[in-house]
Amino acid sequence: MRMPAGFLINAMKKQNLVILGSTGSIGKSTLSVIEHNPEKYHAFALVGGRNVDLMVEQCVKFQPEFAALDDENAAKQLAEKLKSAGKKTKVLAGQKAICELAAHPEADQVMAAIVGAAGLLPTLSAVQASKTVLLANKETLVTCGQIFIDEVKRTKARLLPVDSEHNAIFQSLPPEAQQQIGFCPLKELGINKIVLTGSGGPFRYTDLTEFDNITPEQAVAHPNWSMGKKISVDSATMMNKGLEYIEARWLFNAGAEEMEVIIHPQSIIHSMVRYIDGSVIAQMGNPDMRTPIAETMAYPGRIVSGVTPLDFYQLSGLTFLEPDYERYPCLKLAIEAFAAGQYATTAMNAANEIAVEAFLNRMIKFTDIARVNAKVVELIQPQQINCIDDVLAVDKQSRLVAKEVIVSLKA
């Protein structure tokens, strides 16, 4: 049973948040939610990559105890600028320091929002420290799902999904399932299928003959969501939905027959759960990431997110389409990669990061992204993934192979 709005949060001390990826889209939305609830939450530590100016701005506004940047030179610049501004925030640098912040004894919640494989080790550090982890980093489950879920179970860390689709599924599940993320018995709880929705991106009606000519500017212009460049391209190829499919399989302990992917262009229904009695429970709302962020921060209570309420009278209609794998080969590849094993999903994810970067830099065509991903998965030797070092080894090898494939495409 869910607590009344604000009940649990009001009864507790102010929650300290470590925001991994504070300068990114999810990080900025998290800070917006904190701004709406200053009496309940404190930005204890902010972590970024190399965006010094934005980190300075965030530190001045939210006054965290710690700030960390992955890039050491950027961290030095940050320290100098904060000192000049008279701020006492302690500045740290590098992956080791970031992992230590994720596991800091004074941290109550960790928002895991670093994009890509770079977020893997800090997120794992938070789990190993038994933190409440608000999971927005898809790659953690895509690259080492079994290892990660096993660690969650072993450490009794609380895992709450932030991705709008997975959060919608989470909210549509019975309380017993919410308490068993990663190992809930769906059938025993009367659940028939997890229904994952996706907008289909900006090119769902574009003629396939035009796909070779799609530009980075067109690909990052998502029709519904405000997101970073990489995830916007992933949405356009539906690799984003493929990664979410893999993530959902791990989060909800779902078999292939318990998964359904459908295209819902309006992005109003964020995902659904089918029950064995014919009921379908869906979570709806305006497409704004502050809603799922606020839900995870307050769980099992509710807090103000700053999101405009859904106006049903403004809806022109809700439509649904079956995914077209010719239009979205990356989605098909992701489903097949999960069936092949953890090595394949790791290889695919690494290849995709390299391919998307190459596309954004105009080195390859939009349609080459899927070609690079498929070729890398084909070339990487099938192997057993037993530990994090195995994951990192496959990730590193796959990135090198992806770069070679890109060179061959340009030849």
UniProtKB/Swiss-Prot annotation:
Keywords: Isoprene biosynthesis, Manganese, Metal-binding, NADP, Oxidoreductase
Binding site for Mn(2+): 163, 165, 244
Binding site for NADPH: 23-26, 49-51, 137, 139, 228
Annotated positions binding 1-deoxy-D-xylulose 5-phosphate: 138, 164-165, 199, 222, 235, 240-241, 244
Gene Ontology molecular function: 1-deoxy-D-xylulose-5-phosphate reductoisomerase activity; manganese ion binding; NADPH binding
Entries under InterPro entries matching the protein: DXP_reductoisomerase, DXP_reductoisomerase_C, DXP_reductoisomerase_N, DXPR_C, DXPR_C_sf, NAD(P)-bd_dom_sf
Record's catalysed reaction(s): 2-C-methyl-D-erythritol 4-phosphate + NADP(+) = 1-deoxy-D-xylulose 5-phosphate + NADPH + H(+)
UniProt-listed SUPFAM superfamilies: 1-deoxy-D-xylulose-5-phosphate reductoisomerase, C-terminal domain, Glyceraldehyde-3-phosphate dehydrogenase-like, C-terminal domain, NAD(P)-binding Rossmann-fold domains
Cofactor: Mg(2+); Mn(2+)
Gene3D superfamilies registered for this protein in UniProt: 1.10.1740.10, NAD(P)-binding Rossmann-like Domain
EC number from the UniProt entry: 1.1.1.267
Domain of life: Bacteria
Pathway in which the depicted protein is active: Isoprenoid biosynthesis; isopentenyl diphosphate biosynthesis via DXP pathway; isopentenyl diphosphate from 1-deoxy-D-xylulose 5-phosphate: step 1/6
One GO-annotated biological process of the protein: isopentenyl diphosphate biosynthetic process, methylerythritol 4-phosphate pathway involved in terpenoid biosynthetic process
Pfam families associated with the record: DXP_redisom_C, DXP_reductoisom, DXPR_C
PANTHER family registered for this protein in UniProt: 1-DEOXY-D-XYLULOSE 5-PHOSPHATE REDUCTOISOMERASE, 1-DEOXY-D-XYLULOSE 5-PHOSPHATE REDUCTOISOMERASE, CHLOROPLASTIC
Function: Catalyzes the NADPH-dependent rearrangement and reduction of 1-deoxy-D-xylulose-5-phosphate (DXP) to 2-C-methyl-D-erythritol 4-phosphate (MEP).
Family matches, as HAMAP family: DXP_reductoisom
Family: Belongs to the DXR family.
The protein's name: 1-deoxy-D-xylulose 5-phosphate reductoisomerase
Source organism of the structure: Mannheimia succiniciproducens (strain KCTC 0769BP / MBEL55E)
